Design a protein with these regions (language model features):
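N-terminal pre-catalytic "stem/leader" segment of glycosyltransferase-like enzymes
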Residues: 1-96, 102, 119, 259, ...
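Short, polar loop motifs at secondary-structure junctions
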Residues: 10-12, 104-108, 121-129, 194-200, ...
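Active-site regions of enzymes building and remodeling cell-envelope glycoconjugates
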Residues: 23-30, 41-46, 95-97, 116-122, ...
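Catalytic donor nucleotide-activated moiety binding site of glycosyltransferases and closely related
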Residues: 32-35, 174-211, 215, 257
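Structural alpha-helical scaffold elements that stabilize or flank donor/cofactor-binding regions
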Residues: 67, 113, 219-220
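Alpha-helix C-terminal capping/helix-to-coil transition sites in glycosyltransferase folds
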Residues: 70, 116, 222-223
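Catalytic core of nucleotide-activated saccharide and alditol-phosphate transferases
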Residues: 80-184, 308
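Catalytic binding pocket for nucleotide-activated donors in carbohydrate/polymer assembly enzymes
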Residues: 202-209, 214-310
Length: 313
């Protein structure tokens, strides 16, 4: 059985796929240059015709090139599904087809693509209920052993006072700035980077013009004692920041109160902004949280995710 990944381009996504190679026969679907050129040509011609031109035959060519079989699995993500010829590849794949929805989407999108897949999963529990899709735990890009090795190279001072935030504005800057001020008053060293976007109204000293590559983001994370995350409106699932906290032995200041419901919750590791009392912030910064169990960490590894996808095919 081969497992194909289609549209997984981000650096941390490729790291996840690489970590699976020891236990699974994983492949990345590569679209040949000539297929992309033909697709662009036919798409241009199609704009001049009264009906769209069927391009599923190009998807079949790509699948045949990779030697897919009925027992194989195709794993797609929602962010790249409608780009280029990806939907045509998914629709003509002969094996078990899975869509992982990692960002917030609407019912119109889900209804338009549901028929292409055997199973649709989301990392966000509220989105699962709203859109009638299956819940899947967020995955961390690295195995427990690889994360431990990365953490051992951490440049963190271990003082509990180095705090980092990195993310697009997305209307969250007011909350991020309030958190920054509260941490500054506690004598924390701040490494905050708010990436400007269309929601940015007034730039602060923490605003930057471009997002950092994942390796740089990872370096910042490893060098911090406390990670800061502010969830988007409507977002209830866990982000990579929660998993970085667990795997790298960090602390997290977050707006996501759902972590209090988890077995891994420790008030010495998690501070819930807007829920926990500001008076408890010094205690949080000074606390020594309980180590996270290996069983808990494994639940969020790529291997655990893939074991479930294989079992449910």
């Amino acid at each position: 059985m081969k497992i194909f990944f289609l549209g997984w381009k981000a650096e941390y996504e490729r790291a996840m796929i690489e970590s699976l190679k020891d236990n699974f026969d994983v492949r990345i679907v590569q679209v040949p240059g000539y297929v992309r050129r033909i697709y662009r040509l036919f798409r241009s011609l199609g704009k001049r015709l009264p009906v769209p031109m069927p391009l599923e035959w190009l998807g079949r060519r790509v699948n045949a090139r990779h030697g897919e079989r009925p027992g194989d699995i195709l794993v797609c993500n929602e962010g790249e599904l409608l780009h280029g010829i990806n939907a045509g590849i998914a629709s003509t794949f002969n094996g078990h087809k899975v869509l992982l929805v990692r960002d917030l989407v609407d019912r119109k999108f889900i209804d338009s693509v549901r028929g292409l897949f055997d199973r649709v999963y989301s990392f966000d529990p509220e989105q699962c209920s709203l859109l009638d899709v299956e819940r899947l735990d967020q995955f961390f890009p690295f195995s427990e052993a690889a994360a431990r090795q990365l953490a051992s190279s951490s440049s963190s001072t271990g003082t509990g006072r180095t705090c980092t935030f990195l993310g697009r504005d997305k209307g969250r800057s007011a909350t991020v700035l309030a958190i920054a001020e509260a941490l500054r008053k506690q004598g924390c060293e701040l490494d905050f980077h708010i990436v400007r976007d269309k929601s940015t109204q007034v730039a602060s000293p923490y605003h930057v013009s471009a997002i950092y590559p994942y390796r740089e983001s990872l370096r910042m994370t490893l060098g911090a004692d406390v990670l800061v995350e502010v969830n988007q409106t409507g977002q209830a699932g866990y982000t990579l920041r929660v998993l970085e906290t667990l795997f790298f032995g960090k602390k997290l200041l977050t707006t996501n109160a759902r972590v209090k419901q988890e077995s891994f919750y420790d008030p010495g590791r998690f501070f819930i902004w807007g829920v926990d009392s500001p008076d408890d912030l010094p205690r949080f910064l000074e606390a020594r949280p309980t180590p996270v169990s290996a069983e808990t960490l494994y639940r969020y590894t790529p291997a655990a995710m893939m074991e479930r996808l294989v079992a449910e095919r």
